[in-house]
Design a protein with these regions (language model features):
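Short beta-strand segments at enzyme active-site cores
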Residues: 20-26, 59-64, 126
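Asp-based, Mg2+/Mn2+-dependent phosphohydrolase catalytic module
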Residues: 37-60, 68-105, 109-176
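Short, charge-patterned binding micro-sites
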Residues: 25-32, 64-70
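Short secondary-structure boundary segments
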Residues: 1-14, 57-60, 64-72
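Short, acidic loop-to-helix structural element flanking the phosphoryl-transfer center
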Residues: 1-22, 30-45, 80-90
Length: 176
């Protein structure tokens, strides 16, 4: 595990602006028995420590273990919390009193961007790191744009500072 170059700086900037940083992640590995919650927590704690050393933080991590090929009790053909469904984003909005219409999602999969649209977010930023560089991902993310939902493209989250002014603009300056 390694942080994407520039990620901590973007998160620190968001933290400084009062913009909640919430990770919503599909974790089918838990559902399929490849690893457990304990291992996921260990990885998240390591990320938290690395970010803290760089002056940044994540406010919450919401994970979905459900998968169509998961083992009981995590086997589900289309769980509402699993992206591209909106469930995790709706839970985050409830827990943090977020205005979804002023919120954005950043992700490396078209399903992340699609989840943002399904939840009624203002937009999504598709990054080409991780899965984002796979054939068809960028095009599928672009296809989510429309009806007021904006899709931006970036090489990595390091370009995220370009997104931060949009958050303030959408939210009347409060960044939520």
């Amino acid at each position: 595990m390694r942080l994407v170059d520039g990620a901590a700086a973007v998160l620190a900037e968001a933290n400084g602006r009062g913009i909640p940083v919430i990770v919503v992640t599909n974790q089918s590995g838990i559902g399929r028995g490849l690893f457990g919650w304990k291992e996921l927590v260990a990885v998240e704690e390591r990320i938290e420590a690395e970010l803290a050393a760089l002056g940044a933080r994540v406010d919450a991590v919401l994970a979905c273990p459900f998968h169509s090929e998961g083992r009981a009790p995590f086997r589900h053909p289309d769980h509402p919390a699993r992206k591209p469904n909106a469930g995790l984003l709706l839970r985050a909005a409830e827990a943090f009193t977020l205005d979804l219409g002023s919120s954005w999602i950043v992700g490396d999969r078209a399903g992340d961007v699609a989840a943002g649209r399904a939840a009624g977010l203002a937009g999504g930023m598709h990054v080409a790191t991780g899965w984002g560089s796979q054939p068809g991902e960028r095009e599928a993310a672009r296809a989510c744009a429309g009806n007021g939902y904006r899709v931006l493209e970036a090489a990595s989250i390091a370009e995220g500072p370009d997104l931060l002014p949009l958050l303030g603009e959408c939210a009347g300056g409060n960044g939520r």
